[in-house]
């Protein structure tokens, strides 16, 4: 695998060359600082731009053209990564090496048509596509109430990170969606195209000079952007007393969450030590939390831990019976304390490192995952795969103990089920 980055001031090109795949994957990211009210705008564009364009005015015509391009596929999504939000468009198509000369450029041109030449009527997006996208997004926003885990996590974020990008729901908010019109969405679209930072990632087997020429001949963006600031969110305030919150909900099972802020961690801790710590605590099937809380004491239906180096937090989540709340909290705190005291084995450290390396190996089998590695390198300064393999095995017991002391318990949140009986597990 060979990586090359090209910068022409208006956008960056990232070539990830490999002979493992017959298809080429192209991903285009539009990036800007997170603004809460703009989240729904970006979600709307994610939906509407792949529904039609000036050349292909219906979804049916788009589908026919995809078939003509040897079943090329297109997709889009939005994400929030720390201080920034990304609007991403993807295209996957068969390499012209296996079809006919010129198909790489032809498919790329089709892809760009969707992004840069939308179907605009009277200074606004076409009404049917606009309404379809708005209704779909409204359903997604309203579905938060139907997903206990999503709702509980969102409520925890509100308690811990109010007023910061971490708090914001990636789907956006109903009150912001209600303000969107066909016209103001188009105005925002034009601002996005002009002002967003843009990165183009290409994965597959191709000639770099030829692909560079294809991109530069067709990608007509020339606005020079100011350098972006850091994605990473570091916390400056920490609670002296843990915040305890309970919210009733008409569900059968209660959701228990522990939220920790990370205090002044190093880059090595962010990328490596935290991964090992989390795996041992609750991030693997044989973790301490699973063994002690779930298997030995039967105090939960499920339990795990996750972390975000970008957002500098660690979260423990468990599905419990509300009657076991006090016992579960006590036992979870006990396992956290064990990590601080170094009460874990060398074998647990080694297994966490092996699991980490195995996950890196799997990345090489998926073009989308390969892109994620280089996105993290570009946006966060994270190491590439070869360096990650070398560095993960450098994590020591002392490193894990030192990191554990930087986890500051901020909030214990319970989404309390009111349908539950008192039988326990």
Stretches with model-predicted labels:
Residues 143-145, 160:
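Glycine-rich, mobile lid/loop segments that gate access to catalytic sites or pores
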Residues 139-143, 240-253, 357-367:
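Short, low-order "capping/linker" segments at domain edges
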